[in-house]
């Protein structure tokens, strides 16, 4: 009985099927994007882009948006603005005879030591072919379990979806390798938003807003935006997903939007370029609290500061570069008077 009541309470918080045209961050954070399963979220992003912008997907699923007038897609990529959209999670690795599910972590080969601990006893969702199914990541009964391990690994994790047999699991539409995610999103009116991967969602929303609402951005030839899938797996600033995008585009410069803990200022930029895959990149970082946890938190004013910083880089930075180039050309010598 308690399982059914808890699952009913969890299922009441369902992500909207039709996101608004200008979603607040708390709505934008509702759709998960676990590693290798980013398509549902990226489809939402693509649906909100202006029709005149050229979009494409690469082999790993990243969404690439080319700015500029029609026919400008063949121009060399002057600047790439990128954000990783994927997040850690689980997949269903086993369906037990008693209806419980075993899970395996997605993302980094060795998750942080508290990764599973922070998800223990929390509501979760299995994203099936037909939609989301509510569940709970189990906590062992205190009076029945053996001594608690020093590090809680995935071998101790079970997912309860309210079924008591494999047939009951199948009736819910759940299959092996379906992704399992947490989606507890809390947004206070005019205050901070707390959600898994909140900083990544904020950066993606800032990029979407710039593409949709600022003509100088959408009309800028040689400028490309990338919403990168599989960025938390592999090396480099955006993992193997970022490496694939760099090989495809060969930009002159890549700007990576990401969250960072411990910042005193809302946004921190860097003028130092780092080489990667034959291109150069630098970060623009958003202040975030409780980074890399299921309750990652960002402030709306900080997100607005990130939007202004992006415009400063993309729009006004280009203007300053043109002015600097003009100033570097010495003035012509006046002709002698006759």
Question: Over which residues does each language-model region extend?
Answer:
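Bacterial N-terminal signal peptides that target proteins for export
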Residues: 1-5
């Amino acid at each position: 009985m308690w399982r059914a009541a808890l699952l009913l309470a969890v299922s009441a918080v369902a992500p909207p099927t039709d996101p608004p045209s200008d979603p607040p961050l708390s709505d934008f954070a509702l759709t998960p994007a676990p590693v290798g399963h980013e398509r549902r979220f990226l489809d939402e992003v693509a649906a909100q882009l202006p029709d005149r912008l050229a979009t494409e997907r690469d082999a790993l699923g990243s969404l690439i948006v080319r700015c500029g007038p029609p026919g400008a897609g063949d121009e060399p990529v002057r600047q790439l603005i990128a954000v990783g959209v994927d997040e850690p999670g689980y997949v269903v690795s086993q369906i037990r005879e008693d209806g419980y599910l075993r899970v395996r972590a997605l993302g980094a080969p060795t998750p942080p030591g508290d990764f599973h601990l922070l998800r223990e006893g929390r509501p979760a969702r299995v994203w099936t072919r037909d939609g989301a199914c509510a569940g709970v990541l189990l906590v062992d009964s205190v009076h029945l379990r053996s001594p608690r391990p020093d590090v809680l690994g995935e071998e101790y994790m079970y997912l309860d979806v309210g079924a008591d047999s494999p047939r009951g699991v199948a009736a819910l539409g759940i299959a092996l390798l379906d992704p399992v995610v947490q989606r507890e999103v809390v947004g206070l009116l005019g205050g901070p938003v707390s959600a898994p991967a909140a900083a990544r969602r904020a950066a993606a929303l800032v990029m979407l807003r710039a593409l949709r609402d600022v003509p100088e951005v959408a009309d800028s030839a040689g400028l490309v935006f990338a919403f990168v899938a599989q960025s938390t797996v592999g090396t480099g600033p955006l993992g193997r997903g970022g490496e694939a995008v760099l090989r495809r585009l060969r930009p002159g410069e890549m700007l990576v939007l990401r969250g960072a803990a411990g910042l005193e200022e809302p946004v921190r930029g860097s003028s130092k370029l780092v080489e990667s895959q034959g291109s150069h990149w630098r970060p623009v970082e958003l202040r975030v609290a409780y980074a890399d946890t299921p309750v990652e938190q960002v402030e709306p004013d900080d997100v607005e500061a990130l939007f202004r910083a992006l415009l400063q880089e993309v729009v006004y930075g280009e203007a300053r570069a043109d002015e600097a180039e003009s100033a570097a050309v010495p003035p012509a010598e006046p002709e002698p008077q006759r």
